[in-house]
């Protein structure tokens, strides 16, 4: 099992699919990495040589922000918005949708489970 960017890559999958197990690498980035390293698209991870795995590691380390670094940067960006006190920061702080979605109904994923409100007594 190859280990790239701190992630165990599944050995029986194609390299294009296996690279997407790394946080921060999607379809497009995986295809770009394969193209840079000049690996055939249909090659599987267990067919890669150690030199090819090393080349993939070098390309990812040099050109892409992945895993912990990406998560840290995303968290820092959200924290910066909250510290600024801008509208987006306030929405993050309150746990509400940030990008203008309606909240009268829906938005349950972001707001959490519905809180029961006592009904009118007769």
UniProtKB/Swiss-Prot annotation:
> According to the UniProt record, where is the region Disordered?
99-122
- SUPFAM superfamilies named in the record: S13-like H2TH domain
- The answer to whether UniProt assigns keyword Transmembrane helix to this entry is no
Please, one GO biological process term? translation
Q: Which Pfam families match?
A: Ribosomal_S13 (PF00416)
* GO CC annotation, single: small ribosomal subunit
Q: Which GO terms describe its molecular function?
A: rRNA binding; structural constituent of ribosome; tRNA binding
Q: Transcription regulation: present as a keyword of the record?
A: no
Task: Name the cystine pairs.
Answer: none
Its biological purpose is as follows: Located at the top of the head of the 30S subunit, it contacts several helices of the 16S rRNA. In the 70S ribosome it contacts the 23S rRNA (bridge B1a) and protein L5 of the 50S subunit (bridge B1b), connecting the 2 subunits; these bridges are implicated in subunit movement. Contacts the tRNAs in the A and P-sites.
Subunit structure and binding partners: Part of the 30S ribosomal subunit. Forms a loose heterodimer with protein S19. Forms two bridges to the 50S subunit in the 70S ribosome.
PANTHER family assigned = 30S RIBOSOMAL PROTEIN S13/40S RIBOSOMAL PROTEIN S18 (PTHR10871), SMALL RIBOSOMAL SUBUNIT PROTEIN US13M (PTHR10871:SF1)
Q: Which family does it belong to?
A: Belongs to the universal ribosomal protein uS13 family.
Task: Quote the protein name from its UniProt record.
Answer: Small ribosomal subunit protein uS13
State the species of origin. Rhodopseudomonas palustris (strain BisB5)
């Amino acid at each position: 099992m190859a280990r790239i960017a701190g992630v165990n890559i599944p050995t029986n999958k194609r390299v294009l699919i296996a690279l997407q197990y790394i946080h921060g690498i999607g379809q497009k980035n995986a295809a770009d990495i394969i193209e840079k390293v000049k690996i055939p698209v249909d090659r599987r991870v267990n067919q890669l040589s150690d030199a090819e795995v090393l080349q993939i590691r070098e390309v990812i380390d040099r050109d892409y922000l992945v895993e912990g670094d990406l998560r840290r940067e995303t968290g820092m960006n959200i924290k910066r918005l909250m510290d600024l006190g801008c509208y987006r920061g306030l929405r993050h702080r309150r746990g509400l949708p940030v990008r203008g979605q309606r909240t009268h109904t829906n938005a349950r994923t972001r707001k959490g489970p519905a809180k029961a409100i006592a009904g009118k007594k007769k």
